[in-house]
């Protein structure tokens, strides 16, 4: 959900001027002092070093739900009725984003502000080590975390915006866009350093670990291995509705397998036997000790965080207000695009345990004991991972707290990365072992050699609403064709009011009219340019001086 645009106010402006300028200016009047250690550019001890890096989370916490407003809305799976139709959520849902669209502005700027803060922290802690203020162990923990977070930020940025500026504590430009390969080289460098600096996973996923760095390396190499489009390639398709050709680089896919194997071989991670207990406040960040959560962003709620995690708030904004039992009818901020997403899965895999957690078609209200239905003609299904069911009456209470930690990486992703990379390399039978681990937990049939199509569908089964949708479409080069699947949805046809055999209340008709309009807009508006997001303005609307992406 969108918060007030003040966000961090003066703190953001201070970080912007401090971080961006100092990292991009190598010839200013102070450049001769860059290697001098003074009382002003050191921290006092190990705890202070770690605290300095932890300040970067003020730029990650506001993004936990915001990522969904690009990554999930720019797909066939999710639509948004957050506020007026001119607001940023509905705009992204309809593929009408531009450089001023708030979620693009917010994510892009916060990621770069976090990078600037990482850079300053690394430089300061390096000075502190030289000055004897910080131990080697303290340096490893703090700088390892800073490089981990910087790499994650650059990975998000290049996946969504392509070529982006690269600047570190050693210098660089905040406006000149680097090639895709140069951005990934920086990501790999940071994560390789983090892998060597960080300790092994100890059951607390809020702390980046050696295995979390290896998992991100596996993710990065899979993304890089699927040959992200260059600006020139996007330019060639920007105004059309044809997907580009899929291509890959096998050497990078081999590295994805290598790093996934490192995580697996550590023996420190495993799948939680109960899929439905991966989400919720009382299940967050490995509280059950099952060791599937590998890296999470900690949240304590809106009153404590820079911003709480609104993944629950946005998918379940108004609990049980679907018009039944005399209750009001109010639309959530994000909605499952149509019944078909539930129906198709149920037809394909009726025994998949994950379906009941992913799409709720009915929910019992613990306050009145009644069961509420989320299926046409009443409503569309609810994203179940956004409905906290981990503590007493959490279905009604958690949206007032927004305190659930966000999962960035879990062990299931490592297994599926390995399986997919092996399939892309033509080693399908080897992919069966990691692939079937997910299927065994889900209670569905195992396969001897998964196909690429089965791999793609498994990403849906396992990770719906976990901020992968458009990123996978970018990798597989099927953004346009996947979005155009909405033409098969119940409420896409203009005669939906009469052809489906339903009768609707006024509230229901208004809701499904908006569903219809958003499905139509997705189908009509998606273009090749949407393989990139628009380079946005700054948080105050200023021009950032970065060349715009094709088509915007």
Regions found by a protein language model. Name each.
Residues 3-4, 13-47, 151, 187, ...:
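Bacterial Sec-dependent N-terminal signal peptides
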Residues 41-48, 53, 57, 61-64, ...:
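Elongated scaffold/linker segments in the mid-to-C-terminal portions of large proteins
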Residues 41-64, 85-161, 171-185, 189-205, ...:
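Conserved, well-structured interaction surfaces
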Residues 67-84, 199-215, 226-318, 444-456, ...:
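Short, surface-exposed recognition loops and adjoining beta-strand edges that mediate ligand/DNA contacts
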Residues 158-160, 165, 202, 223-232, ...:
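Short coil/turn linking the two alpha-helices of tandem helical-hairpin repeats
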């Amino acid at each position: 959900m969108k918060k007030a645009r003040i966000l961090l106010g003066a703190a953001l402006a201070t970080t912007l001027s401090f971080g961006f300028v100092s990292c991009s200016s190598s010839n200013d009047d102070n450049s001769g002092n860059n290697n001098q250690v003074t009382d002003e550019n050191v921290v006092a001890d190990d705890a202070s070093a770690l605290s300095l890096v932890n300040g970067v989370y003020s730029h990650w916490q506001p993004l936990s739900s915001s990522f969904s407003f690009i990554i999930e809305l720019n797909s066939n799976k999710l639509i948004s009725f957050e506020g007026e139709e001119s607001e940023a959520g509905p705009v992204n849902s309809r593929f009408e984003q531009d450089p001023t669209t708030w979620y693009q502005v917010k994510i892009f700027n916060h990621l770069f502000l976090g990078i600037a803060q990482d850079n300053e922290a690394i430089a300061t802690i390096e000075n502190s080590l030289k000055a004897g203020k910080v131990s080697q162990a303290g340096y490893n923990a703090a700088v390892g975390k800073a490089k981990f977070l910087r790499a994650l930020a650059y990975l998000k940025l290049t996946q969504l915006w392509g070529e982006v500026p690269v600047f570190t504590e050693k210098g660089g430009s905040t406006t000149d866009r680097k090639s895709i390969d140069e951005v990934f080289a920086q990501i790999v460098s940071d994560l390789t350093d983090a892998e060597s600096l960080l300790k092994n996973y100890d059951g607390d996923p809020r702390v980046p670990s050696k295995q979390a760095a290896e998992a991100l390396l596996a993710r990065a190499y899979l993304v890089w291995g699927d040959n992200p489009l260059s600006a020139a390639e996007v330019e060639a398709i920007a105004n059309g509705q044809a997907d580009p050709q899929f291509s890959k680089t096998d050497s990078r896919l081999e590295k994805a397998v290598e790093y996934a194997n490192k995580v697996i071989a550590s023996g420190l991670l495993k799948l939680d036997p109960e899929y439905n207990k991966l989400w919720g406040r009382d299940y967050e960040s490995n509280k059950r000790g099952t060791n599937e959560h590998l890296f999470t962003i900690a949240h304590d709620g809106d009153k404590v965080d820079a911003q709480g995690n609104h993944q629950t708030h946005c998918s379940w904004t108004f609990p049980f207000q679907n018009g039944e039992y005399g209750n009001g009818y109010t639309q959530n901020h994000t909605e499952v695009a149509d019944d078909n997403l539930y129906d198709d899965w149920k037809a394909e895999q009726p025994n998949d345990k994950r379906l009941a957690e992913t799409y709720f078609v009915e929910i019992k209200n613990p306050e009145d004991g009644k069961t509420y239905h989320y299926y046409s003609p009443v409503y569309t299904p609810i994203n179940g991972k956004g409905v906290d069911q981990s503590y007493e009456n959490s279905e009604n209470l958690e949206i007032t707290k927004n305190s659930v930690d966000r999962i960035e990486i879990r062990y299931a992703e490592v297994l599926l990365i390995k399986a997919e990379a092996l399939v892309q390399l033509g080693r399908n039978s080897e992919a069966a072992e990691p692939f079937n681990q997910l299927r065994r937990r889900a209670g569905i049939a195992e396969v001897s050699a998964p196909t690429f199509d089965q791999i793609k569908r498994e990403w849906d089964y396992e990770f719906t609403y976990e901020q992968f949708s458009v990123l996978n479409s970018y990798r597989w080069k099927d953004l346009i064709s996947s979005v155009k699947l909405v033409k098969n949805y119940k409420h896409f046809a203009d005669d939906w009011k009469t052809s489906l055999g339903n009768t609707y209340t006024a509230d229901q008709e208004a809701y499904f009219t908006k569903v219809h309009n958003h499905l139509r807009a997705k189908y009509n508006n998606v273009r090749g340019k949407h393989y990139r997001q628009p380079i946005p303005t700054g948080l105050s609307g200023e021009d950032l001086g970065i060349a715009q992406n094709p088509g915007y």
